[in-house]
């Protein structure tokens, strides 16, 4: 075997970008040739406990586009991305040995599955005498800069935010994207391409809020368009609860989830916007949302696997139903509640749903149907193009009333929310064509239509559109009693 000069390896994970990438920056500083690797882990394409695809078609295609874009970006700066498939804790050390890597640089993750991979990887590298250096790069605030330890993290977001603001935490500056990299060593490696079944074909629905394209390039373009070309940041707080169209919110979440956009870079651009355009409630609110994302990540660090347990962070032993029939009505958007149905159909057909929609459909599953909240969390995991393990499971804990900030029984009044956030029924008609003829004052509660009105508007309940699967207020009150008494109805 010919002598291979020493090199370093950068292992890309949920950090598919060149900007603000500390592992890449440290590798560059080493002065050695860099090999960049992305490894598709087949476990991420397996099934959830409920038998859903762990990574559904919307997210898998967005991931594939993001990896491809990273490869193109690395090529432009003189390097290349090695793409392979297998268990990273086995595959990465094998590659590292073959290229004579002295050090592996990577970003650290938070939850159990990812941490297990890291630990086993480091174990294998130690046997081979290869150094592993992990860095933190997924949040706005670095955990080392927090005014408390992770174990002392406040259980309420408001206290978390106020403590950070009070201590005037400095956000660390971004690392520059490299303009040139040394080429990776020219060594023939046996790489396993991901199988086509990882990336099922998807059909783009023209009703989608945005034609989401994976990758750093598309993420930066979206930021440029939303902040600078469209000048929409100044109105973010007023429009963020919308549900129709590309620009009611930033829509950065898919790129944040895969690390195509760095939260620190977004923060940096918000601060520039405040200097060059305007500083107002909207600019502050976008930073506020980035802090929510941080909070859920730190909560996951603090509580570990409790996040995924039936009893949640508080280990509350609430009884939950396992009603497959009603779950299927919820999942497919056939509950008879237009706001729930429209949002679930949007999710299924596009991989996206507004934040307002997520809160309402989750509340309906937990507080009206009383179905195991983990079923909903798993369906979101499978479908969402912007799935983020910490935010998803943290939000479901919150909605189910088992999160670390659980207070009195809380639920979303679906009919009222529908009228408040979609007064003319524009969003409902967008996704429920069977209700398109109903006027704005009738569309939110079609179950109240008389036989004459059904005929007048061309909607026959139970035929064209389902009758409600539960009585809204009765089901909420029944659930309230169950949670107060802790017994199954």
UniProtKB/Swiss-Prot annotation:
The molecular function GO annotations come to:
DNA binding; DNA photolyase activity; FAD binding
Give the required cofactors: FAD; (6R)-5,10-methylene-5,6,7,8-tetrahydrofolate
Q: Which residues form a coiled coil?
A: none
Listed PANTHER family? CRYPTOCHROME (PTHR11455), CRYPTOCHROME DASH (PTHR11455:SF22)
The primary gene name is cry
Q: Name the chain's protein.
A: Cryptochrome DASH
Report keywords, A-Z. Answer: Chromophore, DNA-binding, FAD, Flavoprotein, Repressor, Transcription, Transcription regulation
Q: Which organism was this protein described from?
A: Synechocystis sp. (strain ATCC 27184 / PCC 6803 / Kazusa)
Q: How is the cofactor bound?
A: Binds 1 FAD per subunit.
Report the record's Gene Ontology biological process terms.
photoreactive repair
Function according to Swiss-Prot or TrEMBL? May have a photoreceptor function. Binds DNA; represses transcription of at least 8 genes, including slr0364 and slr1866. Does not encode a DNA photolyase function. Its disruption does not affect circadian rhythm.
Query: Which domain of life does the protein's organism represent?
Result: Bacteria
Q: Where is the Photolyase/cryptochrome alpha/beta domain?
A: 6-140
Q: Does the keyword Glycoprotein apply?
A: no
Q: Name the family.
A: Belongs to the DNA photolyase class-1 family.
């Amino acid at each position: 075997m010919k002598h291979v000069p020493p090199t370093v390896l950068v292992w890309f994970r949920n950090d598919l970008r060149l900007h603000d990438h500390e592992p890449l920056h440290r590798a560059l500083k080493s002065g050695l040739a860099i090999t960049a690797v992305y490894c598709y882990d087949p476990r991420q394409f397996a099934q959830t406990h409920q038998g859903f695809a762990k990574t559904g078609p919307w997210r898998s295609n967005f991931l594939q586009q993001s990896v491809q874009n990273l490869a193109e970006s690395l090529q432009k700066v003189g390097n290349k991305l090695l793409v392979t498939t297998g268990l990273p804790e086995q595959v990465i050390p094998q590659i590292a040995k073959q290229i004579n890597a002295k050090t592996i640089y990577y970003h650290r993750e938070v939850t159990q599955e990812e941490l297990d991979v890291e630990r086993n990887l480091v174990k294998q590298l130690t046997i081979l005498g290869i150094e592993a250096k992990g860095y933190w790069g997924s949040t706005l605030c670095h955990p080392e800069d927090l005014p408390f330890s992770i174990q002392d993290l406040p259980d309420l977001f408001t206290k978390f935010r106020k403590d950070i603001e009070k201590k005037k935490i400095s956000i660390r500056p971004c690392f520059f994207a490299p303009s040139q990299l040394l080429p990776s060593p020219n060594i023939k490696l046996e790489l396993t391409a991901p199988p086509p079944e990882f990336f099922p074909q998807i059909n783009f629905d023209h009703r989608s809020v945005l034609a989401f394209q994976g990758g750093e390039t598309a993420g930066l373009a979206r930021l440029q368009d939303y902040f600078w070309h469209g000048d929409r940041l100044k109105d973010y707080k007023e429009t963020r609860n919308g549900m129709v169209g590309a620009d009611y919110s930033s829509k950065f979440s898919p790129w944040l989830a895969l690390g195509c956009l760095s939260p620190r870079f977004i923060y940096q651009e918000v601060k520039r916007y405040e200097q060059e355009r305007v500083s107002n409630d909207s600019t502050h609110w976008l930073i506020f949302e980035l802090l929510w994302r941080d909070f859920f990540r730190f909560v996951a660090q603090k509580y570990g696997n409790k996040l995924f347990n039936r009893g949640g962070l508080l280990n509350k032993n609430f009884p939950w139903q396992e009603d497959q029939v009603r779950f299927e009505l919820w999942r497919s958007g056939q509950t008879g509640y237009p706001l729930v149905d429209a949002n679930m159909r949007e999710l299924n057909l596009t991989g996206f749903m507004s934040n307002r929609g997520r809160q309402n459909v989750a509340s309906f599953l937990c507080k009206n149907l009383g179905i195991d909240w983990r079923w909903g969390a798993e369906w979101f995991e499978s479908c969402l193009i912007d799935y983020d393990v910490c935010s998803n499971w943290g939000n479901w804990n919150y909605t189910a009333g088992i999160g670390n900030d659980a207070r009195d029984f809380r639920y979303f009044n679906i009919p009222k929310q529908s009228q408040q956030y979609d007064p003319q029924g524009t969003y409902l008609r967008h996704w429920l064509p069977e209700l398109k003829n109903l006027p704005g004052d009738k569309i939110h509660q079609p179950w109240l239509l008389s036989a004459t009105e059904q005929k007048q508007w061309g909607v026959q309940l139970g035929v064209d559109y389902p009758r409600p699967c539960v009585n809204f207020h009765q089901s909420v009150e029944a659930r309230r009693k169950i949670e107060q008494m802790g017994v199954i109805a």
